[in-house]
Amino acid sequence: MPDAVKVGFVPFATPARGTLIVFCDDGLKFGATATKALGAAVATVKRAAATAQFKGKSGSAMDLLAPEGLKVGRLIVVGAGKVASINDYDLLKLGGAVAGKIGAGDTAVTVVADLPTGAMKPEQAAAIASGIRLRAYKFDRYKTKKKDDENGAANASVTLAVADPAAAKKAFTPDSHVVDGVILARELVNEPPNVLYPEEFAKRAAQLKKLGVEVQILDVKAMTQLKMGALLGVSQGSAHPGRTVIMRWNGGKKGEQPLAFVGKGVCFDTGGISIKPSASMEDMKGDMGGAACVVGLMHALAARKAKVNAVGAIGLVENMPDGNAQRPGDIVTSMSGQTIEIINTDAEGRLVLADVLWYVAQKHKPKFMVDLATLTGAIMVALGTEYAGLFSNNDQLAERLAAVGQSTGEKVWRMPLGPEYDKQIDSQFADMKNTGSRNGGSITAAQFLQRFVDGTPWAHLDIAGTAMASPKNEINQSWGSGYGVRLLNQLVAEYYEAKK
């Protein structure tokens, strides 16, 4: 993985060099271990806090250089807010706040993992460590000249002083694999489109074989034999042929129904013949955020050896305008046999998903399918960049996604489906058309997808506002967020994974 930050766990001992980081609550109270670490410097910290009007609000920080009474070169006090009600996501963000304060010169950092309520539990320390790694990630491989202060936490060695290092390390190991999955998803979204085209994306997904994932790549010939006319129609205008990648992790009981996750992978979207405006078209390299999430999720499940059977499927295309490109007015036949009139070639993601959803439903007979797609600008108008749109034909699945959305901070908001919306995509010339009216655009897109799930319990996550170019936050400073990996990993772990 590209992040170079090293995170470890050690028994507590007051450091004699480097940077010391301690937590306080919103009353400027410290835990017993932090108080011991500060020693006589507690009075100095209190005076500095009064001068700086530092209150210990969650995520805030106060910085003291060469603090009197300590041997370290730098002391950072990070506010944890109201610690009595602190949860795992709060701790993840707190870890991000720690990473955000680490500078390029902080090569050795000690974080005292306790709060006024007591020493952090192993799982809490692991959440801090995960937040540090998530925040420290940077995508800068194409920069040939870097400023001295650009690396920050990425090159630091961070140790968390904990009550039980072995237990903390054990708790962090599976969490670290999930972080790896998030970072992998971010890497894929951040890559330029001249580097990450469908064939290259498929090759990177195939690297999951090293973790024990079965990977099958369908090329144009194979997809033609399967009659995937909807997906192939999108890719026919590109010099880079499309691919469908099927990944399978068999960590559950033999013969047990798998869970299925499907991702839209439009590696670059010009809009095709219905071409987009040039302004911000460069962002369309991220139109494969759903596919990136699925690959990152499969990495996480396999690396942590999740006790579940799971299928990940991604449809990979470029949507380009050339003499062979799909036209408005064309009618294509999907793998399901249903025909689709093309009204707008820029409504291409649903065409890709249509064939992949049908393939997975028919071939793997999953317990449920969750698809992720940067599908519509309409969902951003409705929900902004804080929530993904959730559409589902199954209340239990929707409720579970909403619950883990709250606990992980990768929030979803359920949107309606219904026959009144569905009839808007009926076509005069084919079974359906690929767009409805301007009104309710994200809903009619989801209605289109529902026609290809064949009755399988299903949820659609429209992640157009959350997968890329979303606001930077405590645990992500990257253009690509890796949204969905933690959400779906938690869904699996909490509701579907065999317990030990």
Swiss-Prot record:
Task: List, in alphabetical order, the Gene Ontology terms for molecular function in this entry.
Answer: manganese ion binding; metalloaminopeptidase activity
Pfam family of this protein, just one?
Answer: Peptidase_M17
Q: Where in the cell is it found?
A: Cytoplasm
Q: Where along the chain is Mn(2+) 2 bound? A: K264, D269, D287, E348
Name the cofactor(s) required for activity, per the record: Mn(2+)
Cofactor binding, note field: Binds 2 manganese ions per subunit.
Biological process (GO), any one: proteolysis
Name this protein carries in UniProt: Probable cytosol aminopeptidase
